[in-house]
Amino acid sequence: MKIFCLGLAGLLLAGTWLFSGCKRQEEVHPIGEFLPESEAFWNVVPRTSVLERIGIEFEFTEGPAWHPKGYLVFSDIPANTIYRWTGKNYVVVRQPSSQANGLLFQAGGNLLACEHGSRSITRLSPDGKLTTIVDSYQGKRLNSPNDLCRSSLGAIFFTDPPWGLPELNADTAKDLPYNGVFRWYNGETTLIDSTLSWPNGIALSPDERYLYVANMEIIPTGGEDQYDVFWMRYQLNAEGEVEDKSIFYKAPDTTLPGGPDGMSVDQLGNLFVSGPGGILVLDKDGTHLGTISLPIAATNMAFGPKDKELFITARSTIYRLSMER
């Protein structure tokens, strides 16, 4: 085990000197299991792929985002911190982070964050300016923005479940009567869907024709609740407006560990989604190709350069899936 610490060297970001704490970065070693449903799985996840654990002892990690300059950022919600991983160590980017969850880089290096604490989406620019992008819809406060993605036009799509509210749907501070999927563009917020119970992860297809959203529905049984877990697909027009929607894939066994959370889409349109049993790999037609099983349930994931690496947040742990052919 190696421990990396920058001490008081710190990191200059957002106009403030921020200091790293000591975080353990494990010596990388293989872990996990590949469970193909068909041979097509190996066309997406090469047989030579290696799953490695690269960080431990966090509290609840989320929101990984890869920067083109070659580093990863992610959030630790209970720790109220956004970290950066350089390949050698972890440094604090922002603390407190207003319990940031989903993260996303814009052109120019702006970092967008879904904040549970402020119930908003904010933008942190390289010069340190923090700006609120959206915090309400039709005069009512958002619940707690969870995850987000953006189009080439600059539109931001995001989910707004109540996970950041202490009493969830029963919280007295909850203003909206639903948990929505939204689109923000040029200062205007549009409601895409108000019918999902627990919308969570969200991603766009490479051609931006489809928007995917993870969801969970609770089925009351009079005893222990059961769940429906499925992923929605929204068909978009050239302006990024929704024209149609349908269930893209429904998990057949929701008793397995893990649930519908974050996701990422590769350059060929294959989806990597956190779900029951691990990370489900789905092709662009919604066929389940196989599962990447982890010892800890994945919360979210993001591709590194050229789809050759997938960085996975899993509660206390950070994984890297190397997919060199």
Named regions from a protein language model:
Residues I56-Y71, P96-E115, R119-S120, Q138-I156, ...:
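Beta-rich, blade/repeat-based domains predominating
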Residues Y71-R94:
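Beta-propeller domains
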Residues A79-T81, S118-R119, W163-P166, I218-T221, ...:
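Short glycine/acidic-enriched loop and turn motifs that connect beta-strands
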